[in-house]
Amino acid sequence: MVKQVFAAFPQGSAAGPEKFRGQAAMAGRRARWDLAITGGQPPLRPLRPPVLYRAPLPRTKLEASVPDGQVTGMLEIDGRTVAVSGWRGTVGHNWGSEHADSWVWLHAADFGAAPEAWLDLVLARIRVGPARSPWTAMGALSLAGDRIVLGGLGRRLRVDARPGRLTADVPSPRARLQLSVTTDDGDPVAVPYTDPRGGSRTVRHAALASVELIVRRPGDRALTLSSSRGAYEYGTRRDMPGIVPQPLPEG
C-alpha cells in the first residue's frame, strides 16, 4: 500500500473510485501502478446515525466507496512487473478538519469459512476540549450478502488497541462481534499524518494482519471466522515507543 499527499494530483495520475494510476519513490526504490477496481455493492458510510455526516463532530468523516471489489491491472516495483487479476480490494477515503485523537481502521476479507464475507470497521477516540471520548465503533460485517451494522453512538464496547495488535468486543443491534488482530513486526510501515489544525499523528499500517472473529447473533450458533488478509491501521497523536515514522513517498 502506498499513501501519498499532494497539493494537486500529478499529471497523468488517477485516484479512484474506479481507477488508480500513479508512481512513487522512496529510499532508493520506485513503484508504479495502473489499477482498476469494480464492485457490485453499495458504498458503506459507517458513521451512525447518518446525521453525523452533517454535524460538527466528529471532525473526520469517512466512506468506503467500494467496500469489496475486484482489482485488475499491473504493479511495477523496481522494474519488476506484477500482473493483477481478480485480487480482492477496497476503496475508501476520509475528509474533514481534524484527525481523531486515536483510531483504528480494520478491513478484512477472504475468511476461510465464509469466503465472500468482508469486514470494515473503524474505532476512534476524539478530543472534545481537554477530554478524550471513550472508544466508539462504527462499520459493517457482510455475511452471505447480509450487511450487519456494527457499533454506533452510545454502545459500550471493550477495546485494547495497540500499534501491533487489537482485541475488541463490539455490540450492535443485530450481533455482537469479538475480534482479535495481530501483525508481524516485519510487515508494517509507519508514516506521519499532518493534521489540518496543526501538529501530526503517527500512523502504523500493516497490510497482512491476521484477524480472528467470533460473531454472535440472536437465535444462531456462534460463528468463528479467520483471515490472514487483513489491513490494520493504528493512528495516534502520542509517540509509539520504538517506532519512527518515515516521510511519505515522493510522486
Labelled PLM ranges:
Residues M1-G251:
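Structured soluble/peripheral alpha/beta segments that form catalytic or ligand/cofactor-binding pockets
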